[in-house]
Amino acid sequence: MTTRYIFVTGGVVSSLGKGIAAASLAAILEARGLNVTIMKLDPYINVDPGTMSPTQHGEVFVTEDGAETDLDLGHYERFIRTKMNRRNNFTTGRIYEEVLRKERRGDYLGATIQVIPHITNAIKEKVIAGGEGHDVAIVEIGGTVGDIESLPFLESIRQLGVELGRDRTLFMHLTLVPFLGAAGEVKTKPTQHSVKELRSIGIAPDVLICRGDRAIPANERAKISLFCNVEERAVISLKDVDSIYKIPALLRSQGLDDLVVKRFGLECREADLSEWENVIYQEANPNGEVVIGMVGKYIELPDAYKSVNEALKHAGLKNRVSVTIKYIDSQTVEAKGDEVLQGLDGILVPGGFGERGVEGKIQAAKFARENNLPYFGICLGMQVALIEFARNVAGMADAHSTEFNKETPFPVVGLITEWVDEEGNVEQRHEASDLGGTMRLGAQLCHLLEGSKAAQAYKGNSCVERHRHRYEVNNKYRERLEQAGLVFSGLSSDRKLVEMIELKDHPWFVAGQFHPEFTSTPRDGHPLFEGFVAAASAHQKRDLKK
């Protein structure tokens, strides 16, 4: 199979939405019957985002094969059916690490290691490898043209443009076309300068995606075409919309996919966007609203919980309700108590690391349990629910996790020292292990308890979900917790690790050690999120009757 490559760059400012634009184009091409994948090349020096602060970088998206990747890969999986893996995201840090490892082994036979050709060759090899087996590979270059960090990546794709030729490569550049209220018009000069910067390093864009808060007038598109040396039909206006799931149709209406298909000489059907039309219709026509309180520690940057946010919206689509997320700092719960938890239809406690705010999360779990309020715990959200139950129901007053209190008399949650991975291999860790890449990561099989809410949600006796954690339920306390009424509704493939817990006599109190948000999509949703939002809607209706 001959793979075609579309390289996506950004100019003027960051956060223009390159990832969404790339994913939307991929969705249209997939709707035409093409096999599409997307890669993200990140210019930062970290080997991966695994140890980066969520408040700086946003969430870490975990792939099926256990790679800790950029949150844009979450967008990719939500827009197309192709599953991402570790080949779909790499950083400057990883490239340099691999090149230096080869140099230490003597693979370069004593050569002087340089950015060109050694670093650029390594980048090109990864791009080609990531695209193998697909009709089209869309490659997003992180950062903004003009940043010094991005230069090795830009040089690499310039070389690929020459080596593969025009019939296998296309360069798409996103720019900002701002509207100046004082002048009453949009300004094209930033786009002209951005294209000039890109051309100065040898890349001539074939397509311009012009971002702005409004559609670009026809005369301004003609002006951009003239000054940037791009066909007028390849100047695409991408205005702000109230839903990112409208963007595939917006790009399709301007013929972007036709331009790509013609350029590459691909034979394929017309795009069928009926699934996306259904998503947009459901989003625009809810029959009600539920308010979900998300109790976390990274709430100052909602992107820290990007996949959770999207999964809740997807569940709303399936339940025909709009979901309003109320972000609640867990430290505020510690300071103000239950008053900040009033007026909610459900509580969700997402994953996280570190002691800050953990008691507020425990308090939120207690509030949900005692008030029959739907509760959904994810990763740490499961652990705090178990700690709360151990303290207040099972008679272990000072129960805790050894992550937060190594001296606790009841370490109901502790460091996992050994587990079996998805291929049956035994993984081992200890306290001194590096933080990066040492967690239980990736897709794992979970056996579900017959008759449990978990089994009902999944409509079966097993599921496969992605993990990212170091701590687990301490098996020493399983029997005591079960006797007190806690249900262990999900166990690992070897049945040695607790994957899910729930409460019997509660409308919906379910928690999982894994991250189900990573597999939720707008077209398919996710059974646990759907069950949670359905329970929240039912709780609201019961309250209204009262």
Swiss-Prot record:
GO CC, one annotated term: cytosol
Key words of the record: ATP-binding, Glutamine amidotransferase, Ligase, Magnesium, Metal-binding, Nucleotide-binding, Pyrimidine biosynthesis
Lipid metabolism listed as a keyword: no
Family: Belongs to the CTP synthase family.
Reactions this protein catalyses: UTP + L-glutamine + ATP + H2O = CTP + L-glutamate + ADP + phosphate + 2 H(+); L-glutamine + H2O = L-glutamate + NH4(+); UTP + NH4(+) + ATP = CTP + ADP + phosphate + 2 H(+)
Binding site for CTP: 14, 147-149, 187-192, 223
Binding positions for L-glutamine per the UniProt entry: 352, 380-383, 403, 470
Gene that this polypeptide is encoded by: pyrG
Domain Glutamine amidotransferase type-1 residues, every copy: 291-542
Region (Amidoligase domain): 1-266
Miscellaneous comment text of the record: CTPSs have evolved a hybrid strategy for distinguishing between UTP and CTP. The overlapping regions of the product feedback inhibitory and substrate sites recognize a common feature in both compounds, the triphosphate moiety. To differentiate isosteric substrate and product pyrimidine rings, an additional pocket far from the expected kinase/ligase catalytic site, specifically recognizes the cytosine and ribose portions of the product inhibitor.
Protein purpose: Catalyzes the ATP-dependent amination of UTP to CTP with either L-glutamine or ammonia as the source of nitrogen. Regulates intracellular CTP levels through interactions with the four ribonucleotide triphosphates.
InterPro entries cross-referenced by the UniProt entry: Class_I_gatase-like, CTP_synthase, CTP_synthase_N, GATASE, GATase1_CTP_Synthase, P-loop_NTPase
Regulation of activity: Allosterically activated by GTP, when glutamine is the substrate; GTP has no effect on the reaction when ammonia is the substrate. The allosteric effector GTP functions by stabilizing the protein conformation that binds the tetrahedral intermediate(s) formed during glutamine hydrolysis. Inhibited by the product CTP, via allosteric rather than competitive inhibition.
Binding site for Mg(2+): 72, 140
Protein name: CTP synthase
